[in-house]
Amino acid sequence: RDRSVSRGLGDVYKRQAVLDGPEAGYKVTYTQADAEAVTAEDGRVILMDEHLADSDAMDYDMDRADGEWALSDYVQKGIEVLDNGTGFFMMCEGGKIDWACHGNDPATVFEEVVDMDNAIKVAYEFYKKHPKETLIVVTADHETGGLGLGTGKYELQLKALAKQKQSQDILSRSITDLRKMRKVINWPEMKEFLAEKMGFRK
């Protein structure tokens, strides 16, 4: 049995890139440093993200380490490599907006939407240089989690979400790690933990 299949689709894609990429004429990069060094002269390139999180996806923007590439960096590099005299097509997906909505994690959702917006801004800067020959389409295939905006009053305290320091996924992992270290955790300790990670009142 192919172990890469059991570990998730991300491993399958990585394996295909490693085995099939060079054979098909693609240069494959495995580190961010190598990706940063890629130029249009390199021709056809597959950039593998070395900082993959759960299910082999990019980290949530909220969880991204300093210096780690955001979606906008990939768009910028894509434009640098693809920009030529004959034109090009690029598709960019802010796919983890959907993931955060599935987890009903609004603070992370907002951060992901801003991350996507930053990627669009990069594309828009390119558009301003080539307005007569550039089309940018921004769309969504579905909504998840019941997120909506209306004209009535809300009880949701959005400012409180700004205190959240990590995604629900990382929070769950942190709690699991805490329980592995200590079988019994009292409520004052948990309150301290939640205050640090999520901005809850002590």
Report the location of each language-model feature.
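Active-site His/acidic residue clusters
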Residues: 52-65, 83-87, 91-119
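Solvent-exposed loop/turn segments at secondary-structure junctions
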Residues: 11, 34-36, 52-55, 94-99, ...
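Loop/turn elements at helix/coil->beta-strand transitions in domains of secreted/extracellular proteins
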Residues: 23-27, 41-45, 83-89, 130-135
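Metal-dependent active-site segment of extracytoplasmic phospho-/sulfohydrolases and closely related
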Residues: 115-157
